[in-house]
Amino acid sequence: FATIVSCIDSRTSAELIFDQGLGDIFSIRIAGNIINNDILGSMEYSCEIAGSKIITVLGHTKCGAIISACNQINRGHLTGLLEKIRPAIELEVETGGMRNGENLSFVANVSRLNVVNMLHQIREQSSILATLEREGKIMIIGALYDIDSGAVSFFTP
């Protein structure tokens, strides 16, 4: 019934966070919960072919990929992945203090903005998913999981 794009961080298992068993949801995991063509194809399959009714992009606090992007880490293939997070860093203007991975308020805000950016990318890059959403056949929403409290905040930008 649901497709969840979440991070590879072991603390962010969608099955555990949402109390779902194996086979209950489509779980797509990638560092920084970023979107690429393979992930879009997986979401299109889960919704158009398998009948999933909701896509949730699930970010989380204290995300190592977000922290690495905030710290401008450049290493191998990781560099390209972190570049997809950079627009969220540039959009974050609310947090005072250091604009790096040591400022956890900054990191949390970037995590939320990254989810918002990924939601926009889904709608812009997949005409299939955008059409299904426009027709009311699926919902595309964002969520942020707080590692410390276990709370999940849902939102639609």
Language model region names:
Residues F1-I34:
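Short, conserved "active-site rim" segments that organize catalytic pockets and cofactor/ligand binding
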Residues I4, I28, V57, G142, ...:
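Divalent metal-coordination and catalytic microenvironments
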